Amino acid sequence: MSEARSVASGSSKLLGESLDPVATAPSSDASTSRSGFSNYLQPMDAESLIQQHEALLFRRAYPRNARTLKQTEKQLTKIANSVNRLGDADADLSPLDAPEVSGIAGTSVTSNFSFAIVRWLVQKYPAQLAIDWDWFEEEDRFGATMPRFLPLLEDDAMVEAHVPFRDWLSAAKGRTNEVAWIIERFDSLNLSDKEKAEIYDSLKLHVTWRYGVRSSRTGMKRPTRRVFFHDKPLIQRRDVSLVGELNSPAIPVRRLSRAEGEKILDLARETSAVRYRELHGFTYGDVRRVLKADLGRGTEVFVMGVAPENRLPLRAYHAALIFKNGVPVAYFEGLSICERTESGFNLYYTFREGETAWLYARILRLMRQLLGVTVISIDPYQVGHENEEGIESGAFWFYRKLGFRPVWPELMKLTQAEERKMAEDRGYRTSPRMLRKLAAGHMIFELPDAGNSGWDRFQTRNVGLAVQRRMAREFKSDPKEIRSHSIEFVERALRIKSNQWTNGEREALHNLALVLAMIPAIEKWSAGEKELATRIIRAKGGADEAAYLKLMQRHAKLRDALIRLGS
């Protein structure tokens, strides 16, 4: 998960204070009272506007009945006018810029988005973009880069202080939008997309996107043929069995057309960008490989992979955007190798009083179905390591009560001691200090009948570090030497002939060879093991990385070797 640099200020406490449980609880009488709605949209300041907006969004995703939904939709159409009215009254609107609540209709976001996202914005919404020159900092870099597009700029930029770069750009672009003009110039370069991105991203240009209502959180919604109404209490964590969900019947899934996939990826990029965020799978999602799954209870999930040119060298990557009654409520990121997946589940702040545990369990069921994964790893940050929001929310116990365990023995002992205290005193609460200790390491979930999978100490980073040490030890720290040697060795050991392979398959070979070359006696594998390893390499660069994972799950020797290298 990556986040574009935000120029907003604020904290997660703002939203936590604004969400009134009575306003968000579907079972509350207040959610359908006429008086509650008739007085609802009279914001006197930005904070009260946020409170009203977030409660309305929650009601839209979790409506109690058709009447509530209709009233909610009507109130949301008034949000942009409320923002404008507060602005006209010179109210302080800076709270609306906080990342936790950004994306409200009538506002904008400013961030140093990546080249890929800015180029996409230019394609979709060129008239809504502008450079925020107040945040222009990389003058030297700009002066060194832009002469290729601005003739004679060197005469100013190379020797003068306080160069009026904005004047140069304004004179050159004519009537073209300044952001669009810059992107057009970069696209004209005879370079790969990655090389263009490296140069553009080094400029750290802050782009303001003044989005329309449909792109805002206020107005963003997928059309739904059928709404699921919550006329009964929401599903709580105590009602969810992760083991039961993982073993539940298959979830209905279908592959979208290219046009449908493009629409979903547009929504995914929008819902991230208005929150100052970027996700690799949304930015580089493959429109040809988008799947739609129906989880039930009005919940749709769209799962996407990435094209071969943007894949990770070793792990398979999948992202998912999750809708509740047409409203985007969460996203998921899975980084997988063999049967192990690193799970990143992010519920948007507004919806954290919803059916979080059930939703997470259903997503994991879907990942097991699509990818064959049975071991789920949680990064310490998700649990609260260097993440005070995770500490405040008790994220550790959320995962622990679903069946996850700390992988470090010392943290498992602390966990069991805390559990004994809670069993003896129902009013006992783990202190923030203890939660920070518990969050220091990874957590893992395995199905009960699987036993210890051997993945406890594994980290992909360790595999990469082992490659670096070998490069320093045997190849004088020369990356070209270790690559060429590894490729030649693996091609010979596995009897690979790659001359007819696709570019993606060859790229996969070039990356995986660095790891395979470190496996002892790989040349002595059986013919069947070598043939399967070759299929695994090709699948990494093939159409769908799910095939890569499922083939890896069949190769016991490769799996064991990877665990040793990464542990």
Predicted regions: what they are:
Residues 414-423, 435:
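Extended amphipathic alpha-helical segments with heptad-repeat/coiled-coil character used for oligomerization
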Residues 144-154, 158-190, 194-198, 330, ...:
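Acyl-donor binding region in acyl/amide transferases
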Residues 122-273:
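Long, charge-dense tracts
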Residues 1-155, 160-164, 172, 176, ...:
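Long, compositionally biased intrinsically disordered regions
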Residues 249, 253-352, 361, 365-371, ...:
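A conserved beta-strand-loop-helix scaffold within acyl/acetyltransferase catalytic domains
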Residues 210-228, 304-314, 318-322, 357:
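Short secondary-structure boundary segments
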Residues 393, 423-425:
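Short, surface-exposed amphipathic charged segments that create phosphate/polyanion-binding patches used
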